[in-house]
Amino acid sequence: MDDSSSEARAGIENDTTVRSRSPSVDSQSYAIPMPEEIEEQLSEESSSFDDSNSVESNEDQILGRALPESGQHAFSQDSQEFEPMLDVSKHIFDSLMQAIDSADFSEAISLQTKTSAVINSKSTELKQLIDETKVRFSQFKERFEKGSLTAKNIRGNLRYSKDKIEKINALVRTSYPIEFNEAREKILERPLDDH
């Protein structure tokens, strides 16, 4: 079993020496270039991170001066130079505090909730107005169609009445010319009311 496993290892080693460890495709040719705005944000964040690191190193220096020499070497097994240990919880806490300021975050959520409520109420109100407008438009359209039909009927009745009056005038003028002229003079002499 040892011989077969050593042969298999030798075969694998030979196989890996033949293959190239570099990728067959250059991934940089498919990379999407980073916009300048994002690069600026990243550089600003890294500068603010450097500032916070300098504050932490200042704190470490103050702590180093405050602790006696024996206290600094208490945790190291060797008598070599003391290396400051990383406080993970403090680092995570500081990172979270920098990333999310709780007051600003709650204000943003509150503002977003209020804005969402206003948008929802206005969209509901707009939908109601659209529905009311559709109903009113159909009512006005129906009234207009009825009004145009009534106007056509009235126009036809006026034409019919005008024709009848002209026929009656012609008949009265020929049958009773004296009375017709007297009545006509009375009508023309009658004063017209301005109101």
From Swiss-Prot:
- Keyword Ubl conjugation, does the record have it? no
Q: Name one Pfam family in it.
A: KxDL
Grouped into one coarse class, the protein's main location is other
Q: Compositional bias (Polar residues) at which positions? A: 19-30
Q: Where in the cell is it found?
A: Endosome
Matching InterPro entries? BLOC-1_subunit_KXD1, KxDL_dom
GO cellular component, alphabetical, reads: BLOC-1 complex; endosome
A biological process from GO: regulation of protein localization
| Region feature (Disordered) | 1-80
- Record field: compositional bias (Low complexity): 44-56
* Keywords of the record: Endosome, Transport
Function of the protein:
Component of the biogenesis of lysosome-related organelles complex-1 (BLOC-1) involved in endosomal cargo sorting.
Q: Which family does it belong to?
A: Belongs to the KXD1 family.
Matching entries from PANTHER family are given as: BIOGENESIS OF LYSOSOME-RELATED ORGANELLES COMPLEX 1 SUBUNIT KXD1 (PTHR37787:SF1)
Q: How does it assemble?
A: Component of the biogenesis of lysosome-related organelles complex-1 (BLOC-1).
- The protein depicted here goes by the name Biogenesis of lysosome-related organelles complex 1 subunit KXD1
Lineage start? Eukaryota, Fungi, Dikarya, Ascomycota, Saccharomycotina
**Encoding gene, per UniProt annotation:** KXD1
